[in-house]
Regions:
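S-adenosyl-L-methionine
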Residues: 1-185
Length: 185
């Protein structure tokens, strides 16, 4: 049941139906319970489970997470910081593309179930995949601004990674973290 709800409520179909039932910014349990529920049998639980894994891992890569161990770019065993940042950028982009594919697959499934394939947008732009480390989301240009180049996204990602590395290094110096052990000391 939980996978069913996660998949459905995170679909563009549910977003459209909620917009019809509750056109204001207020959303209450009543509007959710009024959504037309179809007995569709089995939805693909892999989608919601994998998306939860991806987003949880993304969150745990941040120092503000209770489960933060160490900066993710320090886990690859690279001898050069440039190589570590390159690998982290590549993995961040790959994770964002995987999440985009799963979200699109989920949207397509629910649009087909409700026969709304021509009414709702099923494709998810990479800039809407709200992973913290998705460069296209984190550094999306403001409305009306020109699109950024791949090199600009990479550079902004490196800058943020460098700031986070400095923060972690200060934490190590102050005794909050250890180079030898993951997480808080």
């Amino acid at each position: 049941v939980m996978d069913y709800l996660l998949n459905f409520l995170n679909s563009s179909t549910a977003e459209m139906l909620i917009g019809i039932l509750s056109p204001t910014v207020s959303l209450n349990v009543g509007e959710i319970s009024n959504l037309p529920a179809l007995d569709v049998g089995v939805c693909n639980p892999h989608i919601s489970q994998r998306l939860v894994e991806l987003f949880h891992s993304d969150w745990d890569a941040r120092e503000t997470s209770w489960d933060f161990a160490r900066p993710p770019y320090l886990r690859g065993g690279h001898s050069l910081l440039q190589d570590a940042f390159d690998d982290w950028y590549r993995r961040s982009c790959e994770t964002a593309v995987e999440a985009q594919r799963l979200e699109t697959e989920n949207n397509r499934y629910w649009a087909d179930v409700y026969s709304l394939a021509d009414e709702v947008e099923v494709d998810v732009p990479l800039s809407r995949v709200s992973l913290t480390y998705n460069p296209r989301f984190a550094f999306a240009p403001t409305k009306g601004a020109p699109e950024r180049s791949e090199e600009e996204y990479r550079w902004l990602h490196y800058q943020r990674s460098a700031r986070e590395l400095i923060s972690w290094a200060i934490g190590v110096t102050m005794g909050r973290y250890s180079v030898d052990m993951p997480g808080l000391v």
